[in-house]
């Protein structure tokens, strides 16, 4: 499994780290002939160097290192958009999802409004499954850049329809107010209740959309955590990937 960690701060400095499914204390040798099967992209909304330093101090002191800081490859990029020195979530997420810079507010289209294929769409043609997790609305700019092609991140009802028709196999987050689809047993299998985050139930479905808040999460209301949703999404994708090439999962700690 290939693990990617990325974040964006108000200064538009984004951190990137690439690692395997090993830890610094237990490192397994990989055969030169082996290939990465699964890809995990973890995004920290607003996560710049200052936020990383604070997390380091809070969890272990100034000499502590977070797990991704021990990855074999780390880097910093200045991710300006196509029309501004200051990017927004839509333009920066489009860059992650497609490899192409675009204008602020645009999702998975270039500066001339031409369609840009996303990672999940490209992988789908090769037999991969894909999933998205966010603590914002699942129609918010960052997750939406991986499935929606539209000229405004704020057209969230249209973005919601694009998710239903997309190649995303499991999407967990908020955003009930943007979806017209009612809770149903149909495809996609829609759930609004945290109690239905059950792998035994979900693994029998082909496409799952879980919406646990009207918009973004308010943790005081008992919404599921990012960890809980990510674990469910991983179980779902691992179950599906037994009969396919592998999977891609993006999980964002939003807002």
Where are these regions (language model features)?
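Hydrophobic membrane-insertion alpha-helices, especially the h-region
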Residues: 1-3
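N-terminal Sec signal peptide cleavage junction
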Residues: 7-9
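Anion-binding catalytic surfaces of enzymes that hydrolyze or transfer phosphate/sulfate esters
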Residues: 196-255
């Amino acid at each position: 499994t290939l693990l990617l960690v990325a974040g964006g701060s108000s200064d538009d400095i984004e951190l990137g780290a690439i690692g395997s499914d090993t830890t610094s204390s237990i490192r397994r040798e990989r055969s030169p002939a082996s290939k990465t099967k699964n890809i995990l992209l973890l995004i920290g909304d607003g996560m710049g160097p200052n936020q990383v330093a604070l997390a380091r101090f809070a969890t272990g002191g100034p000499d502590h290192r977070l797990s991704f800081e021990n990855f074999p490859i780390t880097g910093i990029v200045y991710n300006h958009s196509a029309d501004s020195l200051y990017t927004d979530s839509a333009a920066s997420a489009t860059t992650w999802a497609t490899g192409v810079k675009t204008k602020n507010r645009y999702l998975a289209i270039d500066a001339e409004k031409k369609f840009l294929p996303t990672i999940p769409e490209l992988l789908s043609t090769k037999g991969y499954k894909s999933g998205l997790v966010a603590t914002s609305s699942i129609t918010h700019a960052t997750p939406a850049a991986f499935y929606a092609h539209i000229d405004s991140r704020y057209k969230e009802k249209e973005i919601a329809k694009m998710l239903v028709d997309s190649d995303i196999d499991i999407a967990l987050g908020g955003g009930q107010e943007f979806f017209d689809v009612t809770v149903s047993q149909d495809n996609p299998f829609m759930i609004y209740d945290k109690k239905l985050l059950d792998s035994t139930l979900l693994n029998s479905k082909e496409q799952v959309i879980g919406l646990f808040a009207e918009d973004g999460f308010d943790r005081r209301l008992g919404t599921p955590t990012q960890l809980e949703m990510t674990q469910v999404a991983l179980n779902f994708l691992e179950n599906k990937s037994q009969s396919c090439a592998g999977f891609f999962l993006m999980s964002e700690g939003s807002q």
